[in-house]
Amino acid sequence: MIHTIIKYLLISTTLFFCSCHKPKTDIITPAKQLIERQIGERAQSIHFEYIEPSEGKDIFEVIASDGRLTLRGSSSVAICYAFHTYMKEACKSMKTWSGEHITSVMPWPDYELYEQMSPYELRYFLNVCTFGYTTPYWDWERWEKEIDRMALYGVNMPLATVASEAIAERVWLRMGLNKEEIREFFTAPAHLPWHRMGNLNKWDGPLSDTWQQNQIALQHQILTRMRELGMQPIAPAFAGFVPEAFAQKHPDTQFRHMRWGGFDEEYNAYVLPPDSPFFEEIGKLFVEEWEKEFGENTYYLSDSFNEMELPIDKEDKEAKYKLLTEYGETIYKSITAGNPDAVWVTQGWTFGYQHSFWDKESLKALLSNVPDDKMIIIDLGNDYPKWVWNTEQTWKVHDGFYGKKWIFSYVPNFGGKNTMTGDLDMYASSSVKALRAANKGNLIGFGSAPEGLENNEVVYELLADMGWSSDSIDLDDWMKIYCEARYGGYPDAMEEAWKLFRKTAYSSLYSYPRFTWQTVVPDQRRISKIDLSDDYLQAIRLYASCADELKSSELYRNDLIEFVSYYLAAKAENFYKQALKDDSENRVFAAQRNLQQTVDLLMDVDRLLASHPLYRLEEWVEFARNSGTTLQEKDAYEANAKRLITSWGGIQEDYAARFWSGLIKDYYIPRIQLYFTKDRNKIREWEEQWITSPWSLSLIHISEP
């Protein structure tokens, strides 16, 4: 009793001091409106209050007593994350990509004073590639939901690259090119991320006037909402890549012709040398045109070397360091020429991905002539050194990036592949080790940069919480809270299931979590890896055994569809591998028998996934077609969307393989069937015909899976 009285005396004192300070902008209204979009009129009963940031970092408090709920925060996103935390922990409720489990308990359940400060100034989200693998054809309705979700997870620094090409077009017109020359430069929408990073030109293009205009309008809506919520979006900047027509008009400039991804030269980029006066001129124009359209911004992303090495003599170290020094200085100056207050943001992915090129002296050279307070490095993939590169984490190799500000980030998804993978133990602890490291340098942020969204929701829920935690998270405790909020209960079998998931699929990160039937034959370039162990399959059986108790939960049912589909697909995988073995040993009848077993199981998988809210080709195609304004444009966008998740282009075949209804039935199954015929050499021709032919849904959803 005494403890309670003291606690509320402290609360009252806090309230008194809070009332003496007000933020420069209204942080309450945007947060309240967002919460209303989640729970409707119930939001009217919530009290909202502003509190001062702590040491320049966001802080929030939650108090619920006698039916009165008060959310306090230092920013709109802090209040939104406070609401998300309260709903998850006190109301046992959750809203995710795949659905929701929202209890309507009123009055608001009591909840102890909950106070939390983020150890990070910035909490970053998205990946350049997300704008290809997930969002290329999204409309405002879908973007609004995603920005809401970001705020609920406490994100305050999202990437915002929509409409980059519309701005670039204006710049190139001012540089003397005509529209035809400019449009030939751009790829189709789903491949634009790689165009923006200088990896790819022309592929599946061009872009229409209508597309450019619509993207400008969409970006206005995106930025307006992000800014209302107090987010600090990262805008695109010029990275040195120019249209072929521009290179041809300036033969005296020594452009470097880059190579990437196994594409023919005509699709590869030309990059300006750093000593060209064009570099700063074009960079300045780009920032000016962007801000003329969208308003002032602080953070600008420019990546000139993503997964590409400069065509230089690697043995001449001094020449290499000199060139990198010049590039770093020129990129920085090209951005600040357009806005002196701008900060250059760059992805640190390539520093780890090509670690043999980016030794200490090379990265020091790139950074050497850029002021420490005018650059942020997103150390993108801290999960990859352990699981793929077999190196130390990049920030450790480079001593906390030599005084530059940096963000600790993960890449928990590649290509939008949606089978189960992720190292939960790492996600619950590795960033905390960085926070406490003596050589962490100027670590100011935490983030996640998935190439594809709408998958492995447990991973993103955990990462959201890590953005607000100075300590490692106890996964045993956290999983109980997660399951109770997601499913409405945590029976013993569920607990055992998740222990096994954490021991199997969620104990590691695979770059290419694909089944063999998704690649026809084993991919020797990018080795597919997926957990099919007995423990993993037992986890699915245990999860399914909770159906009677939890079947009223939408999220339980959706996860059940997903997990049982994996179970059946794993059985299909065994038959398919045997079919391949039979085929290689010329056992024709045995191969056909095992192939048919594979097909029968995969058809069951397809029927199940047709009832899942996310794992359907139908929605992917629908977004693409809805982005077109003419039949020709609709067909082109559909083909582009389907190409990305199948043949891709270059050496990226099946990189973005999806475990989706519609794709399994109409693409993966016919393709493996064709392989087991005398016409297997016609697979590429068949793929192209499927990609370029309009697809239509031919399967009825199962209402009660």
Region spans (language model):
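Sec-dependent signal peptide recognition
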Residues: I2-I11
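Contiguous, structured surface segment used for ligand recognition
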Residues: H21-Y120
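Active-site-adjacent substrate/metal-binding segments within catalytic domains
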Residues: Y120-D139, M150
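Catalytic-core regions of glycoside hydrolase
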Residues: A43, M94-P109, L126-T130, A151, ...
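Ordered core of a single globular domain
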Residues: S553, R557-D606, K665-D666, R671-L699
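C-terminal functional modules
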Residues: W517-L550
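C-terminal motif of bacterial Sec signal peptides marking the signal peptidase cleavage site
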Residues: F17-S19
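Residue-level detector of conserved catalytic or cofactor/ligand-binding positions
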Residues: I700-P705
